[in-house]
A protein has these predicted regions:
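A detector of single, family-specific signature residues
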Residues: 1-409
């Protein structure tokens, strides 16, 4: 016997609907997202399993505390795309009305009737899950850093563009220079002796100090005094926000690099021609996971990463368009792999150049190269083997294919 659970998750209360194999309602309940609420629900799940009942659950997310809770209690979890749920609602209600219990009911019945078209969640190891969380949090900090850098750059351009020629706004020099000389007037009032003294105190060479002094003595953009006062205050506020984020990004990068170095997968993932350090290889492996059988084929992986287009056929018409529905984080890191490989892999460079010669844009050529890399990465992931450039080139030679049309056997 099997029960199908529909779980409409929320921050405070989860709606749950349970049906049997015939679609008959077993129970419906609201589960509070508290220790008591989850504990009571867990005991009910354990009782059903003790009676020999298989439990399958449909939920609109592949991770999170509720998903972990269900897995801990032996429930087979099926993540459901929100778009699929939206279309399934029409089976039960054409008015467009919805509620949390109704969505839970739709999820339960959708899983009962359409589970052959869904894939059960195959959770990775705890170490792989931790690495994934670390890389996701690092990317959030990087996005926050980028936002603040853009704001700070725009602010300096508005009243003090010369400061942008002194140093990158995320650098240690900028961290010291901007608070010390927050306005063009502060720099104009400097003597060369004062500047040289400040430069020596902050570790600048005599040559570098001389170059910067020449920059600072150039005429500054004429800006009204009230604009300078307002923008200088904003600059200081942005610097106070930016510097801790810059430090956090550096700490996350080191933590990820150190954490991944202790994992067995580092032995093969680090062999890709993308540099032996940094967070690209750890992020790639974190998105792949280590659950056996998660990826059925390299084509499955390519589609999940958005590296191959979508083809729509109807009668004599055929339309090929960009694949929007995919793992955006995986697509981003595959683009990074493709870009970094241009510096170290001869065949990758040749393939990219061939794509550009055909009139494809940089992004299109990079995406096509990423699709090629995913064929190789799938084999590396599946067999847990390192990348061997010479083996790959020999494979191309055996197949008598030009480097721009390479395949990995």
């Amino acid at each position: 016997m099997r029960y199908y659970l529909g779980v409409d998750w929320a921050d405070q209360t989860h709606a749950v609907w349970v049906v049997d194999e015939s679609g008959t309602k077993i129970t419906a309940r609201a589960v509070a997202h508290t220790a008591e609420g989850l504990g009571e629900w867990g005991r009910e799940l354990d009782e059903w399993r003790a009676q020999g009942i298989d439990l399958w659950a449909a939920i609109e997310r592949p991770d999170g505390r509720v998903v972990d809770f269900l897995l801990d209690h032996g429930v087979v979890v099926y993540p459901v795309n929100p778009k699929a749920l939206d279309r399934a609602r029409d089976r039960f209600r054409q008015s467009g009305a919805k509620s949390d219990p109704f969505d839970a009911r739709v999820l339960a019945d959708f899983l009962r009737t359409d589970h052959a078209h869904l894939r059960a969640l195959l959770p990775s190891s705890e170490a792989a899950q931790e690495l994934k969380l670390l890389t996701e949090d690092c990317q959030r900090h990087i996005r926050q850093q980028t936002r603040l850098v853009n704001q700070l750059t725009a602010t300096l351009k508005a009243y003090y563009p010369r400061a942008l020629e002194v140093a990158e706004v995320t650098s240690a020099l900028a961290r010291e220079f901007l608070p010390a000389y927050p306005t063009p007037a502060a720099v104009t009032a400097l003597t060369e002796r004062q500047w040289q003294r400040w430069a020596r105190a902050h570790g600048l060479s005599a040559a570098r100090a001389g170059d910067l002094w020449a920059v600072l003595r150039q005429p500054h953009l004429p800006v009204p005094a009230h604009v300078v006062r307002a923008k200088a205050r904003l600059m200081q506020a942005l610097m106070e926000q930016l510097m801790p984020v810059v430090a956090a990004v550096a700490q996350y990068r080191k933590a990820i690099d150190d954490f991944f170095a202790r994992m067995p997968a580092a032995r093969w993932a680090r062999t890709l021609p993308i540099g032996k350090h940094g967070i690209t290889a750890p992020t790639l492996w974190a998105r792949l996971g280590d659950a056996p059988g998660r990826w059925e084929s390299f084509r499955h992986l390519q589609a999940h990463a958005g590296a191959v287009p979508v083809t729509k056929r109807s009668g004599k018409q055929q339309v090929v368009h960009f694949r929007f529905a995919c793992d955006k984080a995986l697509r981003h890191v595959v683009d990074q792999v493709a870009f970094l490989s241009l510096l170290s892999s001869a065949w990758a460079r040749a393939y990219y150049d061939q794509q550009r010669a055909r009139g494809h844009s940089h992004r299109q050529a990079l995406r096509a190269l990423g699709a090629k890399w995913l064929k190789i990465i799938f084999v590396m992931w599946q067999r847990q083997v390192p990348y061997d450039e010479q083996y790959h080139l020999a494979t191309m030679t055996r197949q008598q294919l030009p480097q721009g049309q390479t395949q990995f056997a």
